[in-house]
Each structure stands twice: as structure tokens, then as C-alpha cells.
Amino acid sequence: MRKKQGRLTIVKQTEVARDSYELVLEGELVKHMSQPGQFLHVRVDESEDLLLRRPISIANIDPEKEQVTMIYRAGGAGTKRLAAQRVGTEVDVLGPLGQGFPLEEAKRGEEVLLVGGGIGVPPLYYLGRRLVENGARVTSVLGFASQADVFYEQPFKQLGNVHIATADGSYGAPGFVTDVISQQSLDFDVLYSCGPTPMLKALTARYRERRAFISLEERMGCGVGACFACVCHVENGQAHEYRKICTDGPVFPVGEVVL
Ligand SMILES: Cc1cc2nc3c(=O)[nH]c(=O)nc-3n(C[C@H](O)[C@H](O)[C@H](O)COP(=O)(O)OP(=O)(O)OC[C@H]3O[C@@H](n4cnc5c(N)ncnc54)[C@H](O)[C@@H]3O)c2cc1C
Ligand code: FES
């Protein structure tokens, strides 16, 4: 597939939780974006010291306005630089990249469980919107470190039932998303998840035999299949069998790759 790259203009940049920003970009490149779970590779600014792009998931798309929303945590040098960019600034974006969540796996009327942790929550919002449009019934379980980190509870509530968990117990249920799933006896036809590796490992251990899909947000370099920084091994595969998270993923069927 031909690489897509363009300059998008910042039309909104708001802090939605502690050190977490909702960034809305506008421009022609957005017309190529439609698959939930794909990501954009963002050049945070034009300075020489931050040449490496940062991968950030698509959290929402408004095709009519040609706007894409991302939600990111400003944790390191690059994302902090991005958070300092103001409305009206142009940002260099490569994408959409990767293989997103398979929407067709959830049929009309089926129960879908969205399980997100921290910066893994954003791509599940656009996924949930598309699933609801397709007639699936969506329940979301969203985990955060603390109350100050919680974002997008209301938008998710518009899609269906929402359960929030915080690790320190300051909001919602105390503990992890997996605790909530057990306590509430939540079941599903299809599960989609994105979040930290320990969470994805726990879900894989439980739901290996189920219709479940996980998105990996851990390792990335070039974003386009050229550098091998994102390689992961296939479960029970030969030593030479691998997948590239950037081009084969970031979404994989549960149990396909070694976490
Ligand atoms: C497919 C994908 C989707 C993602 N979606 C989101 C999202 O929607 N919201 C969000 O907040 N974060 C997301 N991330 C994580 C985000 O890319 C990292 O938090 C970010 O790159 C860290 O950059 P930094 O400038 O804060 O840190 P720095 O420490 O300055 O980063 C240094 C280098 O390491 C890389 N790096 C560091 N941590 C990560 C990481 N966890 N994943 C990938 N590369 C990393 C950076 O890209 C950069 O090249 C996603 C990651 C991937 C792979
Ligand atoms: S990030 Fe370079 S090959 Fe995947």
C-alpha cells in the first residue's frame, strides 16, 4: 500500500485528564481514515532532536469535517512537545497505519466487551461507535491508575454500559479491569482490548479460546515495516516466525503472538 503522509492542522488541544490531551487535527489526509484501531505516526514538531515520530491511535473520526481525534499521555520528551503545540499549528502525520480491529467479527445483536487500560482506552471509543452503528451491544470496562487519570467516561456511556476501575480505588471499582469482569460476571460474544501488556496477558490467559482481539501499544520505531523494532514472535511458531506490530498489527487475534 502506498504510504500516506500529510500536514494536518490542530483545531483543538485540551487536557482531558492528568497529563492526557485530546488533540483534534483537520485536513485532507483524514479522508483515508476509517478503520478503528489504526494509528497515526506523528512528527511532534520540526526540531532536529525529535525526528522520531510517535505512534498514536485514532480515537475518533469526523469524515464530514475531515477531523481526526487522538488522546495521548504527555509522558516523555516527544509527547510533551506535542502538548505544547497550539491551535492553528500544522503537524506532519504519516498514516493511517497498521491493521485495526476486525469490525465484521461482531454481528448485529451480539454482545461486545471493550476492555481498555490507560492510554489503550482511546482506540476503543471509535471502535465502539462503529460497532453500535452496526447494531452490536457494547459494554465497556475501562481501567486507570487513579481518578485523576479517568477520561471519556461520558462518551463511552453513550455507547452502552460502562464500568470504571482504578488501581488505587479512588474512583469506580478498586482494582483492575479483570477484577471488574469477574465481579460483574461480564460475558460476551466478542472481546476487543487495548492496554498495557500485563492486562493483555491476563486477558489472553482467560480468553485464549474465545473470539477476542488485542491491540499492542508497546514497541515501535519506523511504523512502516522497515526497522524491525516492533517484531514479536508467534505463539508456538518456529523461531523464524514473527509478526511486525506496525504492519501486521497492532491488532492481533488473542493468542497469536507472544506478549
Ligand atoms: C500502535 C500504537 C498506538 C498507540 N496509541 C497511543 C494512544 O492512543 N495514546 C497514547 O497516549 N499513547 C499511545 N501509544 C504509546 C505512545 O506511542 C508512546 O507513549 C509514545 O510514543 C511515547 O513517546 P514520548 O515522547 O512520550 O516518550 P519518549 O520516551 O521520548 O519516547 C522515546 C521513543 O520511544 C518510543 N516509545 C516510548 N514508549 C513507547 C510506547 N509505549 N509505544 C511505542 N513507542 C514508544 C517513542 O515513539 C520514541 O521513539 C501507542 C503506541 C503504539 C505502538
Ligand atoms: S516499527 Fe519499524 S518495522 Fe515496525
From Swiss-Prot:
<dbReference type="GO" id="GO:0044205">
    <property type="term" value="P:'de novo' UMP biosynthetic process"/>
</dbReference>
<keyword id="KW-0411">Iron-sulfur</keyword>
<dbReference type="Pfam" id="PF10418">
    <property type="entry name" value="DHODB_Fe-S_bind"/>
</dbReference>
<feature type="binding site">
    <location>
        <begin position="54"/>
        <end position="57"/>
    </location>
    <ligand>
        <name>FAD</name>
    </ligand>
</feature>
<dbReference type="GO" id="GO:0046872">
    <property type="term" value="F:metal ion binding"/>
</dbReference>
<feature type="domain" description="FAD-binding FR-type">
    <location>
        <begin position="3"/>
        <end position="103"/>
    </location>
</feature>
<dbReference type="Pfam" id="PF00175">
    <property type="entry name" value="NAD_binding_1"/>
</dbReference>
<dbReference type="InterPro" id="IPR001433">
    <property type="entry name" value="OxRdtase_FAD/NAD-bd"/>
</dbReference>
<feature type="binding site">
    <location>
        <position position="227"/>
    </location>
    <ligand>
        <name>[2Fe-2S] cluster</name>
    </ligand>
</feature>
<keyword id="KW-0274">FAD</keyword>
<feature type="binding site">
    <location>
        <position position="246"/>
    </location>
    <ligand>
        <name>[2Fe-2S] cluster</name>
    </ligand>
</feature>
<dbReference type="InterPro" id="IPR017927">
    <property type="entry name" value="FAD-bd_FR_type"/>
</dbReference>
<dbReference type="InterPro" id="IPR008333">
    <property type="entry name" value="Cbr1-like_FAD-bd_dom"/>
</dbReference>
<protein>
    <recommendedName>
        <fullName>Dihydroorotate dehydrogenase B (NAD(+)), electron transfer subunit</fullName>
    </recommendedName>
</protein>
<dbReference type="Pfam" id="PF00970">
    <property type="entry name" value="FAD_binding_6"/>
</dbReference>
<keyword id="KW-0001">2Fe-2S</keyword>
<dbReference type="InterPro" id="IPR050353">
    <property type="entry name" value="PyrK_electron_transfer"/>
</dbReference>
<keyword id="KW-0285">Flavoprotein</keyword>
<comment type="similarity">
    <text>Belongs to the PyrK family.</text>
</comment>
<feature type="binding site">
    <location>
        <begin position="71"/>
        <end position="73"/>
    </location>
    <ligand>
        <name>FAD</name>
    </ligand>
</feature>
<comment type="function">
    <text>Responsible for channeling the electrons from the oxidation of dihydroorotate from the FMN redox center in the PyrD type B subunit to the ultimate electron acceptor NAD(+).</text>
</comment>
<dbReference type="InterPro" id="IPR039261">
    <property type="entry name" value="FNR_nucleotide-bd"/>
</dbReference>
<comment type="subunit">
    <text>Heterotetramer of 2 PyrK and 2 PyrD type B subunits.</text>
</comment>
<keyword id="KW-0665">Pyrimidine biosynthesis</keyword>
<keyword id="KW-0479">Metal-binding</keyword>
<dbReference type="InterPro" id="IPR023455">
    <property type="entry name" value="Dihydroorotate_DHASE_ETsu"/>
</dbReference>
<feature type="binding site">
    <location>
        <begin position="78"/>
        <end position="79"/>
    </location>
    <ligand>
        <name>FAD</name>
    </ligand>
</feature>
<dbReference type="GO" id="GO:0009055">
    <property type="term" value="F:electron transfer activity"/>
</dbReference>
<feature type="binding site">
    <location>
        <position position="230"/>
    </location>
    <ligand>
        <name>[2Fe-2S] cluster</name>
    </ligand>
</feature>
<dbReference type="GO" id="GO:0050660">
    <property type="term" value="F:flavin adenine dinucleotide binding"/>
</dbReference>
<dbReference type="InterPro" id="IPR012165">
    <property type="entry name" value="Cyt_c3_hydrogenase_gsu"/>
</dbReference>
<dbReference type="GO" id="GO:0016491">
    <property type="term" value="F:oxidoreductase activity"/>
</dbReference>
<keyword id="KW-0813">Transport</keyword>
<dbReference type="InterPro" id="IPR037117">
    <property type="entry name" value="Dihydroorotate_DH_ele_sf"/>
</dbReference>
<dbReference type="InterPro" id="IPR019480">
    <property type="entry name" value="Dihydroorotate_DH_Fe-S-bd"/>
</dbReference>
<dbReference type="GO" id="GO:0051537">
    <property type="term" value="F:2 iron, 2 sulfur cluster binding"/>
</dbReference>
<comment type="pathway">
    <text>Pyrimidine metabolism; UMP biosynthesis via de novo pathway; orotate from (S)-dihydroorotate (NAD(+) route): step 1/1.</text>
</comment>
<keyword id="KW-0408">Iron</keyword>
<keyword id="KW-0249">Electron transport</keyword>
<feature type="binding site">
    <location>
        <position position="222"/>
    </location>
    <ligand>
        <name>[2Fe-2S] cluster</name>
    </ligand>
</feature>
<dbReference type="InterPro" id="IPR017938">
    <property type="entry name" value="Riboflavin_synthase-like_b-brl"/>
</dbReference>
